[in-house]
Amino acid sequence: MWISGASPLKVTGRRSPVRYASPIRALLAVVALVLIGQCNGALAQGMPSYDVTGFRDARFGMTEPEVRAVIAKDFGAKPADITSAVNPVEGTTVLTLKVASLDPGPGPAVVAYIFGYTSKKLIQVNVAWGDESNAKSDPNAMIAAGTRLERYFAGYSWSKDTTRAGIPVGPNTVVLFSGEDAKTGAVRLILDGVKYQMEREGKESTSPDPKGPPRLLINYIANRDSPDVAKIEKGKF
């Protein structure tokens, strides 16, 4: 995938060519991103494997008190800095922490720790940059951060034929990277709120202008196939 700027440049994803509107200075980083995406399979043998076990010191399977202690250690957060809520659809409990900065993303970030409906233990962590209320967010800074993270994840080997890079999944949303480990874990790196051009079968189409500022999101998932969320048993209705 390529991300570019004032003059949209060609963005070549793992499956579909895409173009982005964003500053020219992102071009070199994006070219590197594309090459990494295309060569990931060929280079995987010489790369260390990535095991999706959580985020920083927060490990999947930890209880809420354990994760709260880890948050305090990782970010110097106080109990009052952490909010707790229940997802009414999935039945999961979510601990949320806002941090003033988190490299490589620009500006503040939000880290959400999700606990399973049945197990009450950590099953997913989401890290997000970009505030929907901040219309002045710099798209180039968000794209640059996404490029750095894509290159980071692409530097590891993943389960065969599971990696994807530069895949449009919505009018203004692109999966910069996704990969699955040898067990049940998965990572998703998503860029939202960007305008791009996509080339398919020799024809180009342009996405609509984004309705909000750019956002960058990482999902660390413990069980990609069978998440611990509230479900209605088969045959109940």
Placement of each model-derived feature along the sequence:
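C-terminal segment of classical bacterial N-terminal signal peptides
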Residues: 33-42
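N-terminal secretory signal peptides that target proteins for export/translocation
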Residues: 1-23
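Sec-dependent N-terminal signal peptides
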Residues: 23-32
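Non-cytosolic coordination micro-motifs
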Residues: 45-83, 89-90, 124-237
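Mid-chain, structured segments of secreted extracytoplasmic proteins
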Residues: 85-136
